[in-house]
Amino acid sequence: MKRILITVVLLLGGYLAAFGQEFERMVFTAEDGTELNYRLLRPAETAKAKKFPLIIFLHGLGERGTDNDRQLTWGGNMFLNPVNMEKYPAYVLFPQCPETAFWAYKDIPASYDALDAEEQMPAPFKAVKEMIDTYLTYPDIDRSRVYIMGLSMGGMATYDMVSRFPEIFAAAIPICGAVEPSRLAGIEGVSFRIFHGDADTDVPVRCSREAYKALKEAGVKVEYIEFPGCTHGSWNPAFCRDDFMEWLFKQKKSRKYQK
């Protein structure tokens, strides 16, 4: 009985240590002078691994701003969950796009029929890429396990980032996002998991269906999960899936596709 109590105390202590951690407030300054607010969650203090995954979370339109808080509205608590922190330790970045800007495009797309990439990356998007590059120099970052995800506007930016720099990422999770399908043809070595609600009136569900089809035809490892009756907030049922973190952390980039 005494041994059981000691075990329980040790386990509880581990959970409390993880739960006590918070997202740190950070600012990244890009080479062009762009300042990007972001929040950083470090691996749980109890984690024993020598190298950890790097996760980038790109928020949607409604979380833009300068408060360095709103970007945690969706997804932040999932990573702070003490069970997840203990089981899935990682460096997690939540950058915040300024209120007057957009991640991947200069403005909200007038049509989802032709989402061509901007020739020049928007300044916040470019700053995110530079921030990723900076973290990849850290010795305790596992370069074979770099994951990116995003919802709505952030889902579009997830597609955009991976289509431009597929060599960096092991996995991508675009949620209710959109992309010009032809831009996915050259992607190799990245696993995708796409989520969308079939009743979405903000970003049409066909955007994810077409992206899934394009990735499948390109031979990319991809899974598509569609939620019947769900409107734009498909991130809610996505984050509630028991296998959300498990699937993500199983993905590892082969050396063949790393540069």
Identify what each model region corresponds to.
Residues 18-54, 90, 124, 130, ...:
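A domain-start/cap signature at the N-terminus of enzymes
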